[in-house]
């Protein structure tokens, strides 16, 4: 699971979900990538699930890069708790994803298998996304 090793503050404000990604919008390491088409909070479990889906489909011979990191805590109060008495405890770690951001990159010799692996990963994510190649841009 991806979580920060150490954070300065345990609880943070929620990140804003507006605007488009300013960096990380092109495929720079692999040959194919998953590019976000909308805003979302992607949790560490969703990132791990998508990574496993890619690795199980390509088996061996390829390389996967994860370009996002869940560095923001989202808090939640327990069920049936009255209002007040402070902010809830951190429940999830999320990455704030903006449109245009490349989430995963994949290097694999066979294009058909690579596209199928990335499609399976997209189904694990809570966001609309598309598959891009190194030549395509947002």
Swiss-Prot record:
- What cellular-component terms does GO give this entry? cytosolic large ribosomal subunit
Keyword set, alphabetical order: Ribonucleoprotein, Ribosomal protein, RNA-binding, rRNA-binding, tRNA-binding
PROSITE patterns from the UniProt entry: RIBOSOMAL_L16_1 (PS00586), RIBOSOMAL_L16_2 (PS00701)
The segment annotated Disordered runs over 1-24
A Pfam family of the record is Ribosomal_L16
- What InterPro entries does the record point to? Ribosomal_uL16, Ribosomal_uL16_bact-type, Ribosomal_uL16_CS, Ribosomal_uL16_dom, Ribosomal_uL16_sf
Q: Which GO terms describe its molecular function?
A: rRNA binding; structural constituent of ribosome; tRNA binding
Composition-biased stretches, type Basic residues, lie in 1-17
- Chain's role: Binds 23S rRNA and is also seen to make contacts with the A and possibly P site tRNAs.
Q: Which family does it belong to?
A: Belongs to the universal ribosomal protein uL16 family.
Q: Per its record, how is this protein called by name?
A: Large ribosomal subunit protein uL16
Protein's organism: Mycolicibacterium vanbaalenii (strain DSM 7251 / JCM 13017 / BCRC 16820 / KCTC 9966 / NRRL B-24157 / PYR-1)
């Amino acid at each position: 699971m991806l979580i920060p090793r150490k954070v300065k503050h345990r609880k943070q404000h929620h990140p804003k979900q507006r605007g488009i990604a300013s960096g990380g919008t092109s495929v720079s390491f692999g040959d194919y990538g998953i590019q976000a088409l909308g805003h979302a909070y992607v949790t560490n479990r969703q990132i791990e699930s998508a990574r496993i889906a890619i690795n199980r489909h390509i088996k061996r011979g390829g390389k996967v890069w994860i370009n996002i990191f869940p560095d923001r805590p989202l808090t939640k109060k327990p069920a049936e708790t009255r209002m007040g008495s402070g902010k809830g405890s951190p429940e999830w770690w999320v990455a704030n994803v903006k449109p245009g951001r490349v989430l995963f990159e994949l290097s694999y010799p066979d294009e058909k298998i690579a596209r199928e692996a990335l499609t399976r990963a997209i189904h694990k994510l809570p966001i609309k996304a598309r598959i891009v190649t190194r030549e395509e841009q947002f």
